[in-house]
Amino acid sequence: MADLPPLREVIARHGLDARKSLGQHFLFDLNLTGRIARAAGDLTVGSVIEIGPGPGGLTRALLDAGARQVIAIERDDRAIAIQNEIAEAYPGRLEIMAADAMTVDAAELGEVPRRIVANLPYNISTALLLGWLRRADAFERLVLMFQKEVVDRLAAPPRSEHYGRLSVITQWRCEVRPLFNVDRRAFTPPPAVTSTVVDLIPRAEPLAPARFETLERVTAAAFGQRRKMLRSSLKSLGGAEDLLERTGILPTARAEEIPVEGFCALARALDARTLDGHQSA
């Protein structure tokens, strides 16, 4: 464990006040950062990618847990200066990328097994996740902190209040394991809601065959009007009744009733119909 000053002292010295525009909420509790790092498993091989490390509490915990290589992606110059100090204390183990995480292909960083471990900026958390799910096979696991309501959606089963597009796409590519809640008072500044750490384990194969882009289209249409019957909500895809007949799904069913495999069947039917149309043209 490196001899580094307390986080609050580091923040004061660098003037690192949390910026709402960057979705920053800093975590100072070393017990919590250590717990998150341990949840990621054996870090002594491969690479760990951290998004928005801020003052570096989780960065330190990952390195103290034995991480062979941490790649920290940060766009805030003040935080980058702090990360450089941490890198000096852990020679050769911390790489800092001065970049916007939304523009970085994390699936191409570091070495396998590749993990993402992060207290995500809340304002871009779901957008980041959807990007990583497109390349889910590039990661061994993702241990992430979101607002609790987001994790409720990730883990929600069909016919439940929180089941939606994000549930379908995430569960299609990953096993979803909510780990523990983090009280809002653990952060500076405290967010408005409770947070939850979740462990996402990419599946060796998706839950059912489908193309990512098509599954996105189908779920966006279905859950865009979630209270309507599918024969109405899928009209924007054209030929809703035909799609439902091809998949054996009742036209009177609603999106929240359909399991992940059912949405995959709809995506395959949509692609098959598109292919049939091209071949007959």
Curated annotation (Swiss-Prot):
Its main location: cytoplasm. The keyword rRNA processing applies. The keyword Coiled coil does not apply. It holds the Pfam family RrnaAD. CDD domains: AdoMet_MTases (cd02440). InterPro entries: KsgA/Erm (IPR001737), rRNA_Ade_diMease-like_C (IPR023165), rRNA_Ade_Mease_Trfase_CS (IPR020596), rRNA_Ade_methylase_Trfase_N (IPR020598), rRNA_adenine_dimethylase (IPR011530), SAM-dependent_MTases_sf (IPR029063). GO terms for cellular component: cytosol. Coiled coil: none annotated. Its EC number is 2.1.1.182. It comes from the Bacteria. One of its GO terms (molecular function) is 16S rRNA (adenine(1518)-N(6)/adenine(1519)-N(6))-dimethyltransferase activity. Specifically dimethylates two adjacent adenosines (A1518 and A1519) in the loop of a conserved hairpin near the 3'-end of 16S rRNA in the 30S particle. May play a critical role in biogenesis of 30S subunits. Belongs to the class I-like SAM-binding methyltransferase superfamily. rRNA adenine N(6)-methyltransferase family. RsmA subfamily. This is Ribosomal RNA small subunit methyltransferase A.
